[in-house]
């Protein structure tokens, strides 16, 4: 399926909105000590922002691991993102996966408290990379 430029921009904007909504949800569930769910929502905040960035640059991914590979290949290795920023996406994916599927795996309050500002910073960076690209077109 091929998207027009207007459709692509609308989908990118929608995914950015979903990213911020997921981040807000993470903060809300963290406030009631639902740490695994907070990790889930933090991961999906990054996932939606990263998928918006990939789409804006014409890349596609059909799996979570594919998205992480595309981010690493097209943004980390190109110097647009720092290696630790790519690693943060992988770490949050792992926390989300463990919390959702593994027995006896519990995300801690400390892990979430440390992750929230880092995720917010990366969300802002992913979105700013997209905004800079948009301003040049």
Regions found by a protein language model. Name each.
Residues 1-137:
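Terminal alpha-helical segments
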């Amino acid at each position: 399926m091929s998207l027009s430029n207007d459709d692509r921009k609308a989908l990118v904007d929608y995914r950015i909105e979903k990213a911020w909504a997921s981040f807000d949800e993470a903060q809300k569930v963290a406030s009631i000590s639902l740490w695994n769910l907070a990790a889930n929502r933090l991961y999906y905040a990054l996932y939606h922002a990263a998928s918006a960035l990939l789409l804006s640059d014409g890349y596609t991914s059909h799996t979570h691991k594919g998205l992480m590979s595309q981010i690493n290949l097209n943004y980390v290795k190109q110097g647009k993102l720092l290696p630790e920023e790519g690693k943060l996406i992988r770490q949050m994916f792992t926390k989300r996966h463990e919390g959702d599927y593994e027995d006896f795996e519990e995300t801690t309050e400390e892990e979430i408290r440390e992750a929230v500002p880092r995720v917010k910073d990366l969300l802002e960076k992913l979105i700013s990379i997209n905004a800079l690209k948009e301003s040049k077109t």
